[in-house]
Amino acid sequence: QYYLHQCLSPEEIIGRLAAEGAPIQISHETIYQRIYEDKRKGGKLYKLLRSQKTYRKRYGSGQQRRGMIKNRTSIDDRPAIVDQKIRIGDIEGDTVIGKNQQGVIITLVDRVSRFTFATKAKSKHAKGVAQGIINLLKPHQHRCHTITVDNGKEFAFHELVAKQLQVDVYFAHPYHSWERGLNENTNGLLRQYFPKKTNFKKVTEQELQAAIFMLNHRPRKCLGYKTPFEVFYKFGFSSASSD
């Protein structure tokens, strides 16, 4: 139950226990069976399972969000090493918008470690988003190489970000969300803590950071059941996935 309360899936629970060297005599399917048996008896363990479908709400239509951003550099010009996922510091960036366009959360995810940075933006406008990105990554500037974002107008101040952080900013192709698939997936994980209809203006920065702490300390199958925190700060173990 401890791991379920940490929002781990049954598969992640078994994987993490194995990575820690614990003797395991059950499978993740057994955990599911026991959870649903508990439900039939009136128990509430099933409520600890993660939702299978998550959604992101963005402000405005695709046409409203996208436009001609000056001096943008296409993902086509991004160094090949970014796709190889062999170094820390290549970041995917995005924003998540709350109910009725109330409140904006900036999310940044390291492509190798899956380590996530997030903060509430002061506004959904480009300058506020740019400053939020700078504030998040400034303490880690020495480790950052690239940032890849979509073509939303909230990233129009990309040159300010590049100058302040000394990184290269690249833009994915319009409507090619798979080019930032990790960030899209991470935003879905964040929705486990802040569901679709959440008004982000009512979410405190402390509540957001508590959720990000949980994500960064959740063991991931793609990391050999290490956590993003462990990989980001102790990068070098051989079992990191390149998918």
What residue ranges belong to the model's regions?
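Basic, flexible linker segments flanking DNA-binding modules
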Residues: 23-83
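A short, amphipathic alpha-helix used for macromolecular contacts
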Residues: 1-24, 78
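An active-site-proximal beta-strand-loop segment
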Residues: 76-116
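C-terminal domain-tail junction helix/linker
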Residues: 196-243
